[in-house]
Amino acid sequence: MADRYSFSLTTFSPSGKLVQIEYALNAVNQGVTALGIKATNGIVLATEKKSSSPLADPSSLSKISLITPNIGMVYSGMGPDYRVLVDRARKVSHTGYKRIYNEYPPTRILVQDVARVMQEATQSGGVRPYGVSLLIAGWDEGGPMLYQVDPSGSYFPWKATAIGKNATTAKTFLEKRYTEGLELEDAVHIALLTLKETIEGEMNGDTIEIGIVGPPADHLLGVEGVEGAKGPRFRKLSPQEIEDYLTNL
């Protein structure tokens, strides 16, 4: 029955579903596992960097993106769709919100804008839903925030969650290991242990990518002598830092 409605991008099936969104979720479920964990003093985003060829340069592969100095994003699904949404999020943050208010948008505002773009693709003719799910991590006045955005445009705040091929296994593991009052360092270790449960093959600094939202990194500010200036909270761990964490597992 669903096949009768799959030709239309915006027609509901009798069961109340938009079939194209189901197909978009299938694309997400075929992507590599990505996860996010919120701690008391930060957030961890982690994912597998899977190359289609051993000849590919691992340094050119990146799935975690900087949006603003305090917000980062990771995805599972179709890479080209993700890059479009990253460009949109950066444009809204830098040339839209900051130009008007002289500050970067709070995480929730940015999430709402990205979710609106994704939702519009489910009701407009001549387009298709974005084949990605996103995990967006940021630091606001209220502390660290972690959101998941799906192809339908729905978004939810999470303490810890996972998306991608082995999301169910990862979530089951996170439910067992996550505790209230978790520190950022412990969250990084749990993230690596979770990926270890879902990844087939070797884990090292070239096959794992980790981004953290934590205390201001003033050494990354690049500006000296500005009173009250704070460094960015979001940064990606270097391959060597990831290797050090893996050694201590």
Curated annotation (Swiss-Prot):
Keywords (A to Z) from UniProt: Cytoplasm, Nucleus, Proteasome
Species name: Neurospora crassa (strain ATCC 24698 / 74-OR23-1A / CBS 708.71 / DSM 1257 / FGSC 987)
The family this protein is said to belong to: Belongs to the peptidase T1A family.
Database matches in SUPFAM superfamilies: N-terminal nucleophile aminohydrolases (Ntn hydrolases)
Name listed for the protein in its UniProt record: Probable proteasome subunit alpha type-2
Record-level GO BP terms: proteasomal ubiquitin-independent protein catabolic process; proteasome-mediated ubiquitin-dependent protein catabolic process
Subunit architecture: The 26S proteasome consists of a 20S proteasome core and two 19S regulatory subunits. The 20S proteasome core is composed of 28 subunits that are arranged in four stacked rings, resulting in a barrel-shaped structure. The two end rings are each formed by seven alpha subunits, and the two central rings are each formed by seven beta subunits. The catalytic chamber with the active sites is on the inside of the barrel.
GO cellular component, one term: nucleus
Pfam families hit by this protein: Proteasome, Proteasome_A_N
InterPro entries: Ntn_hydrolases_N (IPR029055), Proteasome_alpha (IPR050115), Proteasome_alpha-type (IPR023332), Proteasome_asu_N (IPR000426), Proteasome_sua/b (IPR001353)
PROSITE patterns from the UniProt entry: PROTEASOME_ALPHA_1 (PS00388), PROTEASOME_ALPHA_2 (PS51475)
Main location as per UniProt: cytoplasm
CDD domains (UniProt xref): proteasome_alpha_type_2
Location(s) in or outside the cell: Cytoplasm; Nucleus
Role according to the record: The proteasome is a multicatalytic proteinase complex which is characterized by its ability to cleave peptides with Arg, Phe, Tyr, Leu, and Glu adjacent to the leaving group at neutral or slightly basic pH. The proteasome has an ATP-dependent proteolytic activity.
SMART domains attached to this UniProt entry: Proteasome_A_N
